[in-house]
């Protein structure tokens, strides 16, 4: 079997470094390119330097050259560069795995349009455990239905720039969908001052940014006399990276827009 050629965007970032390692660890993939922004101090260095690997792949800012020798790009950067990379992937017929969060509606629309021409796995979280959590939350929300106050609490490291996290928002979307609600209409982001009694139709979000927290997420369902808490805690970024590589292998040869639920076969159940 010919190894799948995977390029990494943001290869010198916290997530990018782990992705390089994850590609190296997978028996059916090979690192074909590593991208960083122009002016990065990492340009020209071996992509594996930060994790003790010698990959033979130099970090580059030449998107066209990197994609020309790749089957798929994994991108966990920021919305603006991701959308630029997305357009290049469409032009080069390269699949793309998108773990970037914080897209506005226009950005999400661009991803949907691009999926008509290439294969895309776009997910708020690539952890197998988190995606099982989404599946569980759908069941819990349908069974508990009305009568429970719902709050989502998430925590990440001090460097994360968007809040709430994409995973927390996806948890909210799953729960709202199961209850027949529109998250945009029922979400409450933080509370301050004299807020009055809680509106039972809302889904609340609370955010923590501290230290080196990789990712903690809890969905709380509370009513008189009992609480149900569904929690996922990530201890290493490798859980996300390994899932992204798994998605890259899965989407090879496909066109269309998918998420991690598709990769795991959970949307077929």
Swiss-Prot record:
Residues of the active site: 156 (proton donor/acceptor), 160 (proton donor)
CDD domains in alphabetical order: DHDPR_N
EC class name: oxidoreductase
InterPro entries the record matches: DapB_C, DapB_N, DapB_N_CS, DHDPR_bac, NAD(P)-bd_dom_sf
Predominant localisation class: cytoplasm
Binding site for NAD(+): 10-15, 36, 99-101, 123-126
PROSITE patterns: DAPB
GO cellular component: cytosol
Function: Catalyzes the conversion of 4-hydroxy-tetrahydrodipicolinate (HTPA) to tetrahydrodipicolinate.
Name assigned to this protein: 4-hydroxy-tetrahydrodipicolinate reductase
Species of the source: Neisseria meningitidis serogroup C (strain 053442)
Lineage summary: Bacteria, Pseudomonadati, Pseudomonadota, Betaproteobacteria, Neisseriales
Gene: dapB
């Amino acid at each position: 079997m010919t190894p799948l050629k995977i390029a990494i965007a943001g290869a010198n970032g916290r997530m990018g470094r782990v992705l390089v390692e994850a590609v190296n660890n997978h028996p059916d993939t090979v690192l074909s390119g590593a991208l960083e922004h122009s002016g990065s101090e990492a340009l020209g260095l071996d992509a594996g330097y930060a994790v003790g690997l010698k990959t033979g792949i130099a970090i580059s800012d030449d998107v066209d050259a990197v994609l020309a020798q790749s089957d798929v790009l994994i991108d966990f950067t920021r919305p603006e560069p991701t959308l630029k990379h997305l357009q290049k992937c469409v032009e080069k017929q390269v699949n793309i795995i998108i773990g970037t969060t914080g897209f506005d509606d226009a950005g999400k629309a661009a991803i949907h349009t691009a999926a008509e021409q290439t294969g895309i796995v776009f997910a708020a979280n690539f952890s197998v455990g988190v995606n099982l959590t989404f599946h569980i939350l759908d069941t819990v929300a349908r069974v508990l239905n009305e009568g429970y106050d719902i709050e989502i609490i998430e925590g990440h490291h001090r460097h994360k720039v968007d809040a709430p996290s994409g995973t927390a928002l996806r948890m909210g979307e799953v729960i709202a969908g199961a209850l027949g609600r529109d998250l945009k209409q029922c979400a409450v982001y933080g509370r301050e001052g004299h807020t009055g009694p809680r509106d039972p139709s809302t889904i609340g979000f609370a955010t923590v940014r501290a230290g080196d927290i990789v990712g903690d997420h809890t969905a709380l369902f509370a009513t008189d006399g009992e609480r149900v808490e569904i929690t996922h805690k990530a201890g290493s970024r490798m859980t996300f990276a390994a899932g992204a590589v798994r998605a890259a292998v899965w989407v090879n040869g496909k066109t269309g827009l998918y998420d991690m639920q598709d990769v795991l076969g959970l949307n077929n159940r």
